[in-house]
Every structure is written in structure tokens, then in C-alpha cells.
């Protein structure tokens, strides 16, 4: 008799995805972050659902409804902080996941990579809209500043911004629609993640060497299920330490002041995970140029397969490219720091240099370095 796990239409899908999946025997802990992202997504949907039961998307009551969740709802405070800091965990895992893809050449799986870039954009949009919902000062002014960037689009810009706002400023209509989108987008992300996984399983996983591992595969269960559970426990532990000991560490104190359109905070800045892109935006004095650079800083990922000039897929055996990769990581950390600083000397020039370096490494230095490494192979 055939095992039900392999014959039942639903069980068969689960079996081929999480149990009998042939997996390279040498994938390292850097491959754990896909499953961690899945766990983050489930956590965000569940905590978000319970928050939505008590939240009111109205300018008059939004701020007090969040306060009510923290003060009066049973364990509301932990649900709220798990959701807020869960977003930070989500982005930490996302950045590592993308970085792993860049380092080991996973972008050569075109469909998987492109859907991943779409997922990144969608998650960023969802997080931005979620930040607006508590209706604190930084929520309101962040929404005003970021949506206003669309006014840089020639001819249709102003109309587009007012259409998104649902009026002549960020107001009740904006908050209501942001709540609606923030609620629906995680389910779209889940669907996209399923397609992401579907395309990945068409080709099989990459591995640290970047060489085909068809002759050396092991079943996903029990080896990688155990490994993923360990990764999940470590991540949940880190998240709980953050939530229970310093829940406001990554937030902005300004967001504990109710939104006031008549009073602008001294430094308007988004959440920490957008600061690198915000720094690139601010480093260009022209509004349209800044917006284009902001979009390009993420969209550049789509070009990675075309910029790959090396004969080797992975950076594992390419020390020069490795150095450049870690310079890129340091550059992104620098941009994140600059994004949170006021617009004054010396931060302006540091931000401009870091932005130039970011695009130079990806578009110029990495392809040239790969060509040099190719020639070194012949020696």
C-alpha cells in the first residue's frame, strides 16, 4: 500500500516541499533565513489579526486605540510589541537572505530571484503603511514626506499624491486606506512566497560552492527540519529578549506623541530598516533625482544576473569579490547610520560618498573584479 503521505493530493504537496525534498548536503546556516522569514510572516499575520480586532482606523481614535491595546487588552502590550519588533526581525532576516543570495550567486535562478525582489518591494510597502497606523507624530509626518515624493513625477505627480491621500493632505481617508492595504498585503505576500518556493523547487536549492549538487542530495526531513527548528528557536529567543527587555529600542520616541499637522518633528525619519534608502534619497539635492535613486537602490537587484561576469557562480572561491561584498555591507551600515542623522555637515558629504560607493560597487567594481578573477584562473 502506498504511503498516504505520498498519495494524498494535499499531503503529497507538503511531502514534496518539506519532507522528501532533495536538498544539497552542504547548505550552511545562511540558508536558514528562508524558513525564518516564513515564521516571521506567520507571526506578523497572527499578531496583526489580534491587533486589528481592537484597532480603529480613524484619525480621532487611532492613537488612543493603540494605547487601549497596550493598557487594557489582555496581553495587548506583548501582541503590539511582538508585531512592531517582529517587523524588525522580518527585515533583519530579509537583508541576510538577500545578502546570502548575492554572495552565493543565487540570483542565477531568475524566476525565483525576480519574485524575491517583488516580495521585497511588497514587504517594504506593507511595513511603511503599518508604521502610519499608530497615528503618532512620526507616523503622520513619515506618511506625509514619503507619499509627497511621488509629486516629483512629472505632469501627474501632484494629482497622484492627492489621489493616494484621498484629499489635500494626509487625513482620515489616508489612514483608512492604509489600514485596508496593510491588512490585505500580508496575504498577497504569502501567495508570492508560495510562488517563490514553487520556482525554487523547479531548480532545487543553490549551495555554498555554487556547483551542481545533483549527485549529493539528502532528504529535507529530518536533517533540515531540525536545523530550521534550531534557527527558529534562536530567532524567537532574540525577538522575546527584544520585546521583553527593550521593546522601544528600535522605535522613535516621537511616535508616542499623537499626530499633529501643525507641529513638525525636528528630524523626520522612517523606521531603521528604510534608513539606507532614505540616506540615498537625501544625498541627491534634486527631488526627482532623489526619488529615482531611492527606487534604483532596490531595483538594482533585478540587474544582478546581468552584472554577473564571473566564471564561478558563488563568491566562495573569489577573495577579491568577497572583499567588495563586505565593503558593500559596511557601506549599507554606514548609509543606515547616516539616514538617522540630521541633514548637516559632515553627514551630508558622508551620505553622498556612501551612496556613490553603493552604486559603484554593484554596477562597476564587482563586474570588473569578476573579470580580473577570471583572468587569474588562467595563471
From Swiss-Prot:
<dbReference type="InterPro" id="IPR030689">
    <property type="entry name" value="Cytochrome_b"/>
</dbReference>
<feature type="binding site">
    <location>
        <position position="201"/>
    </location>
    <ligand>
        <name>a ubiquinone</name>
    </ligand>
</feature>
<feature type="binding site" description="axial binding residue">
    <location>
        <position position="83"/>
    </location>
    <ligand>
        <name>heme b b562</name>
    </ligand>
</feature>
<comment type="subunit">
    <text>The cytochrome bc1 complex contains 11 subunits: 3 respiratory subunits (MT-CYB, CYC1 and UQCRFS1), 2 core proteins (UQCRC1 and UQCRC2) and 6 low-molecular weight proteins (UQCRH/QCR6, UQCRB/QCR7, UQCRQ/QCR8, UQCR10/QCR9, UQCR11/QCR10 and a cleavage product of UQCRFS1). This cytochrome bc1 complex then forms a dimer.</text>
</comment>
<feature type="transmembrane region" description="Helical">
    <location>
        <begin position="288"/>
        <end position="308"/>
    </location>
</feature>
<feature type="transmembrane region" description="Helical">
    <location>
        <begin position="226"/>
        <end position="246"/>
    </location>
</feature>
<feature type="transmembrane region" description="Helical">
    <location>
        <begin position="113"/>
        <end position="133"/>
    </location>
</feature>
<keyword id="KW-1133">Transmembrane helix</keyword>
<keyword id="KW-0812">Transmembrane</keyword>
<keyword id="KW-0813">Transport</keyword>
<dbReference type="InterPro" id="IPR005797">
    <property type="entry name" value="Cyt_b/b6_N"/>
</dbReference>
<dbReference type="Pfam" id="PF00033">
    <property type="entry name" value="Cytochrome_B"/>
</dbReference>
<dbReference type="InterPro" id="IPR048260">
    <property type="entry name" value="Cytochrome_b_C_euk/bac"/>
</dbReference>
<keyword id="KW-0472">Membrane</keyword>
<comment type="similarity">
    <text>Belongs to the cytochrome b family.</text>
</comment>
<dbReference type="InterPro" id="IPR027387">
    <property type="entry name" value="Cytb/b6-like_sf"/>
</dbReference>
<keyword id="KW-0479">Metal-binding</keyword>
<feature type="binding site" description="axial binding residue">
    <location>
        <position position="97"/>
    </location>
    <ligand>
        <name>heme b b566</name>
    </ligand>
</feature>
<keyword id="KW-0830">Ubiquinone</keyword>
<keyword id="KW-0496">Mitochondrion</keyword>
<dbReference type="GO" id="GO:0005743">
    <property type="term" value="C:mitochondrial inner membrane"/>
</dbReference>
<dbReference type="GO" id="GO:0006122">
    <property type="term" value="P:mitochondrial electron transport, ubiquinol to cytochrome c"/>
</dbReference>
<dbReference type="GO" id="GO:0008121">
    <property type="term" value="F:ubiquinol-cytochrome-c reductase activity"/>
</dbReference>
<keyword id="KW-0249">Electron transport</keyword>
<feature type="transmembrane region" description="Helical">
    <location>
        <begin position="77"/>
        <end position="98"/>
    </location>
</feature>
<keyword id="KW-0408">Iron</keyword>
<keyword id="KW-0349">Heme</keyword>
<feature type="transmembrane region" description="Helical">
    <location>
        <begin position="33"/>
        <end position="53"/>
    </location>
</feature>
<feature type="transmembrane region" description="Helical">
    <location>
        <begin position="320"/>
        <end position="340"/>
    </location>
</feature>
<protein>
    <recommendedName>
        <fullName>Cytochrome b</fullName>
    </recommendedName>
</protein>
<comment type="function">
    <text>Component of the ubiquinol-cytochrome c reductase complex (complex III or cytochrome b-c1 complex) that is part of the mitochondrial respiratory chain. The b-c1 complex mediates electron transfer from ubiquinol to cytochrome c. Contributes to the generation of a proton gradient across the mitochondrial membrane that is then used for ATP synthesis.</text>
</comment>
<feature type="transmembrane region" description="Helical">
    <location>
        <begin position="178"/>
        <end position="198"/>
    </location>
</feature>
<dbReference type="InterPro" id="IPR005798">
    <property type="entry name" value="Cyt_b/b6_C"/>
</dbReference>
<feature type="binding site" description="axial binding residue">
    <location>
        <position position="196"/>
    </location>
    <ligand>
        <name>heme b b566</name>
    </ligand>
</feature>
<feature type="transmembrane region" description="Helical">
    <location>
        <begin position="347"/>
        <end position="367"/>
    </location>
</feature>
<feature type="binding site" description="axial binding residue">
    <location>
        <position position="182"/>
    </location>
    <ligand>
        <name>heme b b562</name>
    </ligand>
</feature>
<keyword id="KW-0679">Respiratory chain</keyword>
<dbReference type="InterPro" id="IPR036150">
    <property type="entry name" value="Cyt_b/b6_C_sf"/>
</dbReference>
<dbReference type="Pfam" id="PF00032">
    <property type="entry name" value="Cytochrom_B_C"/>
</dbReference>
<keyword id="KW-0999">Mitochondrion inner membrane</keyword>
<dbReference type="InterPro" id="IPR016174">
    <property type="entry name" value="Di-haem_cyt_TM"/>
</dbReference>
<dbReference type="GO" id="GO:0046872">
    <property type="term" value="F:metal ion binding"/>
</dbReference>
